[in-house]
Amino acid sequence: AANIDRQAFDPNDGFALISSEEELRLSWEIAGREAFIDFQFIPRQGNTPAAPLIKSLGIDSSTIMEGLDPNYLFWVGDRDLELRDGWEIFFDRVPTRPYSVEKGYLVPGEVTVSTREGRATVEIDGLNSENFSGSLAFIFYRDSPFIHMEARVSTERPATAFLYHVGLAKPETQGQNLEWIDAFDNPRIEPISNSTASVYQTRYRSIALSNTNGSLVVSPFPHQYLYPLDFADNFGYNWAGHEYLDMIDGFAFGVRQPP
C-alpha cells in the first residue's frame, strides 16, 4: 500500500480528494461539471502484473477512459565536454556516438497531494531507470481539462545527453479509436488494430484515443518539449500501436523526441 501525504492539500483551492491505502480520487470543476481521475497503487504480486496506475478518468458519472499506465523511455548518450581553446562544443554531435535506450519503472512509494492557488499536484515517488531516478507528477488546473504529466527525475551519470519518449499504455482497446490531424490538415480516425507501433507525422504534435464517451489527447508542452532547432521539419513526434520499440507491452500511444 502507498503512503499518501495530504498535509499540503487544501479543499479551498477548488479540488476534492478521497483516498484509501490503494486508491486516490481527485475531482475538480470544469465549466459547471465535475471531472475526476482515479489512481490505484497495486504492485506486482508474483505472476500478476501491477495494475495500471490510472484506474479511470471522466466527467460527472461518465467514465471516458480506464486502465491507463504511463511509460517513459530514456535515450541516453554522452556529451563531449572537452574544452577546445577554452570552449565547449555548442553543436555537439551526440547521435554519432554510442547511445542506449532504457525504460523507467514506477514502483509507487510516497504519494504527495498538494494544492496551491487553483492547481493540484499528485506526485508519486519511485520512478527509476538504469540511470535516472525520481518521481512521476500530475498537475491539475481548476476549471481546466488539461492534465500535465511529468517525470521529475535526475541522474548522477556524468556528461549525459538524453531524449525521452513518453506514452500511455492501454491493455484493453475494444471500442477505441485513434484520432489525429495529419500533416496536410486532414482529420484521421482509425479503429485500434493489432499492428506494431509506428511513428505518426501529425499536426500540433497531438494524437488521441477516443470512444463513444469522449477522448483523451496526448500532446507535449510546446516550449518545454524540444531542444533549440533552426528549422521546423515534421519528424513524426507522435507514435501509437503495439509493442513500441519492443519495450512497452501491448497497445500504447504518446509523444517522442526524435533522435
Model-derived regions: residue spans:
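Ordered hydrophobic segments in well-structured contexts
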Residues: 25-27, 38, 121-123, 137, ...
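A short, sequence-level motif marking secondary-structure junctions
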Residues: 40-45, 141, 194-197, 222-225
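Acidic, contiguous internal or C-terminal segments within carbohydrate-active enzymes
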Residues: 110-177
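Beta-strand-rich recognition/accessory modules
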Residues: 206-259
